[in-house]
Amino acid sequence: SISCGESCVYIPCTVTALVGCTCKDKVCYLN
């Protein structure tokens, strides 16, 4: 998995979610 550089501890992935990133272990990851 590639880290998208966005945290999702308090809020879900926002900008990175648009490119397909999902929350895993409090960090947004691609795939």
UniProtKB/Swiss-Prot annotation:
Q: Some GO term, biological process aspect, for this entry: which one?
A: defense response
Which keywords fit this entry according to its UniProt record?
Disulfide bond, Knottin, Plant defense
Q: How is it modified after translation?
A: This is a cyclic peptide.
Q: Name one Pfam family in it.
A: Cyclotide
Which cysteines form disulfides?
C4-C21, C8-C23, C13-C28
Question: Record's InterPro entries?
Answer: Cyclotide, Cyclotide_bracelet_CS, Cyclotide_sf
Q: Where is this cross-link: Cyclopeptide (Ser-Asn)?
A: S1-N31
| Role this protein plays | Probably participates in a plant defense mechanism.
Q: Which family does it belong to?
A: Belongs to the cyclotide family. Bracelet subfamily.
Instruction: Note what the entry says on domains.
Output: The presence of a 'disulfide through disulfide knot' structurally defines this protein as a knottin.
Query: What is the recorded name of this protein?
Result: Cyclotide Hyfl-A
Which organism is this protein's natural source? Hybanthus floribundus
> From which lineage does this chain's organism come?
Eukaryota, Viridiplantae, Streptophyta, Embryophyta, Tracheophyta
